[in-house]
Amino acid sequence: MNLYSYSRIIKFPGHNALVLKRLFHRPYQFKSVPDDIKNNLVTECECFVKRLNEKLPDKSQLDISLTLPNKVPEYHKHVLMLSKDPKGWKNWPSKLEMAHEYPHSMVGTLKSSLKDTRDGSGVLVNELALDGYTSSETHLKFLVIPDMKVYEVHRDRVSDFALFLGDGKQDSRKKLSFNDFLKGSDAVGQTAIHSSGSVANSIPNFQSEPFHSDIAMVCGHYLRDARCGELAPLLIAKLNSIKPNLKTGIVSHFGGHKFAGNLIYYQFNGLKIHNDNETGKIDGLWLSKLLPQNLEFVFRHLDKDIILQDFYRGHMSTAAYT
């Protein structure tokens, strides 16, 4: 796969143009695992999975033969509410957005509030257990990517924080009715003019600290999927041994997977100015089918700017905005 994707756009009637959209900040290449190495990895992984499945209920058996879904949600911002207790991830409610207990309940509050903002539809929200970064009884901390900042938000101001994330309140516009069109183009134009503006709303600001680091987050939402819950701490331990300087955390269910060993690897490539805001140059790789037996192999290739397609689900990168 190339570093660029091609998009066809219409510039003028009857004229097509091809534009290049960069996929990544880093010069990645896509490769497949050679058959001989793949066979060895499969053998090692099958032995591990057999032992792991003995701990799991019948309905949650791990199956490494499942086809990998090469699809990720379309999003431009990932908001991660940092847990009060980095060791308490095994007790996260199955559906955080429906939780009643603080701080988990704030995930639902934030998601709901984002729906009323201008740019909230492309925001992912999760809870993250990350050593060294914790929320308190009164204040929440949020790691926001690609801002690459940790924001502190009072628990009573989560709705205001949604306005900040979503670029203000959604425009309030009058919808044109059929009767408006019956009155003619002048009437339609005047209706649009008088109703197109929204009441000016000030977007609040919040204190933050920089987070200029790579981070790997592993799905470990135990009460949502026991497979993830059993496997996540093993993957974190392996990551910490092979990449001791990499920040690692356990994240709540991030959607669209039936196979444990799901990981998002956000790589920080410096800062840039985008829409008058300073944001990180971020490559976010979504990986799956990771086990302690193959994790080092996958990351050794990533360190050489090689993505192994056998484990690749998709990506999010701010390179597409440049």
From Swiss-Prot:
Pfam families xrefs: Suc_Fer-like
Coiled coil: none
UniProt superkingdom: Eukaryota
InterPro entries in the record: Aim32/Apd1-like
Family, similarity comment: Belongs to the AIM32 family.
Protein name (record): Altered inheritance of mitochondria protein 32
Organism, as annotated: Kluyveromyces lactis (strain ATCC 8585 / CBS 2359 / DSM 70799 / NBRC 1267 / NRRL Y-1140 / WM37) (Yeast)
